[in-house]
Amino acid sequence: MFSSLYPLARASLFKMDAEDAHHLTLRALGAAGRTGLACALSARVPDAPRTVMGLTFRNPVGLAAGLDKDGAAIDGLAALGFGFIEVGTVTPRAQPGNPRPRMFRLPQAEALINRMGFNNHGVDQFVKNVQAARYRGILGLNIGKNADTPIERAADDYLYCLERVYPFASYVTINISSPNTKNLRQLQGAGELDALLAALKDKQQRLADLHGKLVPLALKIAPDLDDEQVKAIADTLLRHKIEAVIATNTTLSRAAVQGLPHADEAGGLSGRPVFDASNEVIRKLHAEVGSAVPIIGVGGIFSGDDARAKLAAGASLVQLYTGFIYRGPALVAECVKAIARERAA
């Protein structure tokens, strides 16, 4: 039902400020989930099970982190047919993020630019929201560092968040690739990443012993990487036996949107313009890690064919964000059906 109404809703939402529209939509989804009205949103999406990271996904099409930073609308989002949901990024302490305006639509390019800056209510409130959700599907919890934490102490923030979210996560994503937190992408450097992942894997094992379950770790990386950087990241993932990698986050490049309104705004660009760059990183990663580290492909998926292209490049699962905002819930079913047809052929 909601899928058929979304084009009308989008016309109204796109007349609003982008962030205001985002918050309005999340509040509506959150209310639907809390009141049981989520059944009215329910999308008819076929099951297409896939096992990755030792987890069985209802279907291989998930929601990327960033849409629901505080985990406040999990049940409403779950009704839209996603095979898995990722919420966050969350930080140890609440923080306001960057000053507004900080989210911009580029409809001519079917893109968004955001410089949100990990605005969230902090990990304690995040955990309460996750615990309150009735959803029992695959739930990824995405963690980051506070803006005022020195980069040299970043590991402390990740370790703290990992400990807090671990009991409630199907998997945990380590976000080191947002361009909107100063110096965060430095953690993608070989030495920095090696030290961070060593600390996280040690903490993961201790938490697994404590809770009696091993929660997989995924690393989210940027598209703005050269061949040498991709190889170094791949080597580090293999060395530390990281369970998955998410490729990719938003890009700093503006090559595809030059001259468009808002193109010069600072922040990360997402949507169609990042599709090819994301696929290239996926291909390069897959060439290095093979099946040892599953890849979750995200970036510029607007159709079933786009989702299939991510899998052809080497991804095992895909996630939607900007395409979901532009096309709505119908995109989820389209992607699942396209992937299922490909596998049946």
Curated annotation (Swiss-Prot):
Its cofactor is FMN. It is found in: Cell membrane. The keyword Acyltransferase does not apply. Keywords: Cell membrane, Flavoprotein, FMN, Membrane, Oxidoreductase, Pyrimidine biosynthesis. It catalyses: (S)-dihydroorotate + a quinone = orotate + a quinol. It is an enzyme of class 1 (oxidoreductase). One of its GO terms (cellular component) is cytoplasm. Pathway: Pyrimidine metabolism; UMP biosynthesis via de novo pathway; orotate from (S)-dihydroorotate (quinone route): step 1/1. Pfam families: DHO_dh (PF01180). Its EC number is 1.3.5.2. GO terms for molecular function: dihydroorotate dehydrogenase (quinone) activity. Substrate binds at residues 69, 114-118, 175, 180, 249-250. PROSITE patterns: DHODEHASE_1, DHODEHASE_2. Catalyzes the conversion of dihydroorotate to orotate with quinone as electron acceptor. Belongs to the dihydroorotate dehydrogenase family. Type 2 subfamily. Monomer. This is Dihydroorotate dehydrogenase (quinone).
